[in-house]
């Protein structure tokens, strides 16, 4: 692989990593009915809208959390989002679980390759469990303070 191909591969992987943070569970919901949304009020949220930074911090109409409403958080330019989905299909998205796990499965239409993108820890108060789990995994302990090797010896 030459330098140009290697740089392209790194760019593709960085884009996939960024896209994995998209709130794809919001597809099909509607933008809040608010005039600040400039013609998008009460319209359906599309795949492209999720990643498009134009709609960053736009709130949905049917969010379920009063304190922390559902909002879009895209970081792609409109052109970048369009090109991304011309190249990749979103196959499956697992939104954050209680433990903080989230992953997205993409398919590259050109290379016919699959990519499983697993998101990292998000630092939100309601997801403190995720940080605690990461800590225990990092020190090789379970929640009771017993190391994995001690538990293994007890069997």
Q: What label would you give each PLM region?
A:
Residues 1-62:
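N-terminal low-complexity, Ser/Thr- and acidic-residue-enriched intrinsically disordered segments
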Residues 35, 45, 49-155:
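A conserved cap/lid and substrate-binding interface adjacent to the catalytic center
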């Amino acid at each position: 692989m030459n330098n140009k191909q290697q740089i392209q591969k790194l760019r593709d992987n960085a884009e996939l990593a960024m896209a994995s943070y998209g709130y794809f569970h919001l597809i099909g919901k509607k933008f809040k009915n608010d005039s600040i949304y400039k013609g998008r009020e009460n319209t359906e949220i599309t795949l492209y809208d999720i990643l498009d930074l134009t709609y960053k911090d736009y709130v949905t109409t049917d969010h379920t959390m009063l304190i922390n409403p559902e909002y879009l958080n895209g970081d792609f330019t409109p052109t970048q989002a369009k090109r991304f989905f011309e190249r990749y299909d979103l196959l499956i998205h697992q939104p954050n679980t209680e433990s903080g796990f989230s992953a997205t499965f993409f398919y590259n239409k050109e290379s016919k390759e699959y990519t499983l993108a697993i998101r990292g820890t998000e630092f939100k108060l309601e997801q403190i469990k995720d940080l605690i789990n990461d800590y225990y995994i990092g020190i090789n302990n379970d929640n009771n303070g017993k190391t994995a090797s001690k538990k293994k010896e007890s069997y």
